[in-house]
A protein has these predicted regions:
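A short beta-strand submotif of the Rossmann-like class I SAM-dependent methyltransferase core
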Residues: 180-183
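A short acidic, Gly/Pro-enriched loop at the edge of an enzyme's catalytic core
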Residues: 167-178
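Conserved beta-strand/loop positions that form the S-adenosyl-L-methionine
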Residues: 119
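Nucleotide donor/acceptor-binding cores
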Residues: 113-114, 164
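S-adenosyl-L-methionine-dependent methyltransferase catalytic module, highlighting the catalytic core
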Residues: 28-42, 46-97, 142-149, 153-154, ...
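Class I SAM-dependent methyltransferase SAM/SAH-binding core
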Residues: 125, 129-168
Length: 327
């Protein structure tokens, strides 16, 4: 691992293979974080999730009676994610934190003209954000009718559209990077899914993945590595507009899954604590808090010791790298 790669894995991430000291809390460290939170002195480091990532900007559209049902359904999510018309602040804030993680993980490694495939991109908000930052993006989803909805919202940037099963399509060349955001928890065979995604990336390229953190202390779903026969879930995967999760991947499953797919793990970032995510009946508290305070709470929670983050944080972002084979 290069010096640049090592620095990118901290302070937000977990270094693959790192050993925990077993210390959950340090009183001086906790006091320092509380003081920073109180006086708004939390640092903005170059590899932090609140630095060098543009705010969400997208063409404002308004629902029309003649829109397809899939557009109207997607629009309800855009009201929360993009346009700031909150009915669930926890969901909206969690999306914003996830978006910042995704963009950070790409911009730390890729030049602006890189080619990125966004698999299961739905209403295309990540595709549009990446395109506006100068990347050459290919939007992909099983729902072809959503492509025109993405076109309606886009103002600038290059996006190609490739609807269908990404693993069955013929692309002209491997991509510099692939994004799989909030999809692997919906498939019966996450190991096979990651392996097929890796085949779409050129050597030296990257996969950025986000998914709920299976080690979160209130997660009721099974661990993939504990399931003897994942095929029993095949009938319920890839449902259109499906919100049902099959497995939630645990951080300690990431490295074995990567090895099976021929990938290296560069960074595992755990983020979105239960308060900023609106869990544990905290939504009413979020309504009383300025978003800047919410963001500082989120930033502070990402500086907890690794064992605490592993079980306390709700979401996970991973950057994989496909190694260049030696000659």
């Amino acid at each position: 691992m290069t010096q640049n790669q090592t620095s990118a894995a901290t302070p937000l991430g977990i270094k693959p293979g790192a050993q925990s000291s077993g210390v959950i809390f340090s009183l001086p460290r906790l006091r320092r974080l509380v003081a920073q939170l109180r006086f708004g002195l939390l640092p903005r480091k170059a590899n932090g999730m609140y630095s060098a990532v543009p705010d969400a900007a997208m063409k404002r559209v308004y629902i029309q009676d003649d829109w397809p049902k899939s557009w109207k359904y997607s629009y309800t999510y855009d009201l929360e994610e993009i346009y700031g018309e909150y009915t669930n602040r926890g969901y909206a804030y969690a999306y914003d934190h996830r978006r910042k993680q995704i963009l950070r993980l790409f911009t730390e490694r890729l030049a602006p003209d890189a080619r990125i495939l966004d698999i299961a991109a739905a209403q295309g908000n990540f595709s549009i954000a990446l395109a506006e930052m100068g990347y050459n993006v290919t939007w992909n989803d099983l729902r072809e009718d959503l492509a025109d909805y993405v076109r309606l919202k886009r103002e600038r940037g290059k996006i190609d559209f490739a609807p269908g099963n990404a693993f069955e399509l013929k692309f002209p060349a491997p991509f510099d990077a692939v994004l799989i955001a909030e999809i692997i928890e919906h498939v019966a065979h996450p190991d096979e899914f990651l392996r097929k995604a890796a085949q779409l990336v050129k050597p030296g390229g990257y996969i950025v993945m986000t998914t709920p953190n299976g080690a979160y202390f209130r997660n009721p779903l099974p661990k993939f590595s504990d399931c003897p026969d994942p095929s029993i879930y095949e009938a319920v995967q890839f449902k259109p507009n499906g919100d049902g999760h099959i497995f939630l991947i645990h951080p300690d499953e990431i490295k074995p899954l990567a090895a099976q797919a021929g990938l290296e793990v560069e960074e595992i970032a755990l983020f979105n604590n239960p308060l900023t995510n609106g869990f544990m009946k905290m939504e009413h508290v979020l309504r009383l808090m300025p978003q800047g305070v919410v963001n500082r709470l989120e930033f502070a929670s990402q500086h907890l010791p690794a064992p605490a983050r592993r079980n306390f944080m709700v979401h996970m972002a991973v950057r994989f790298r496909k190694p260049v084979k030696s000659v």
